[in-house]
Amino acid sequence: MAEFTQPLQRLVPPPGMDGSVVVRLRLIGQMEAWSLTSENVLPQGRKTRALLAVVALSAPRPALRGRLAELLWSRRPEEQARASLRQEIHRLLEALGPAGGGDILSVTRDHLSLRSDAVWVDVDEVMRATVEQPASLSLLEGDLLEDLDGIDPTFDAWLAAERERVRDKARSVAEALALLQQLAGKSRLKGS
């Protein structure tokens, strides 16, 4: 869907966005992050992008700092991994700054979280898809975080599980839709 590969340049927000959303985050396909003023707020570094993605996909629960350090720096000693995490948090807040970084990302001593009312995430829309509301499945143009493979072995394992979770949801809705269409077709044939 072309509207999700370009910055938001129209007054009508994509499905699922309301007036309180200030950042639109695309995690399916190549990662993108746009403010509502069409400013690119995607962090430059891959680790910083991965950090943003993990925090976004952890919602509505906060992402624990220890888990984030383990996912992104599994080959480093814990203290070094936590120091690297602090640097990446700083970079993430800097990148999100034009959209109100500190108001969007909550950072505490133990965890990080995104304000769900301030950030629209394409994966959230897909995960809310139902047989009655299947339109968000059209957002599935590519794999989840397809440009973030190879960051860390632990991250790669986490990413594989997340990709499977998104695929399973899409598959179950698509199969249910196909079954409904098949049943509707049989019922029309019987009524003829």
Language model features with spans:
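Actinobacteria-biased recognition of intrinsically disordered, low-complexity terminal regions
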Residues: M1-V23
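Residue-level signal for inorganic ion chemistry
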Residues: L68, L92, V166
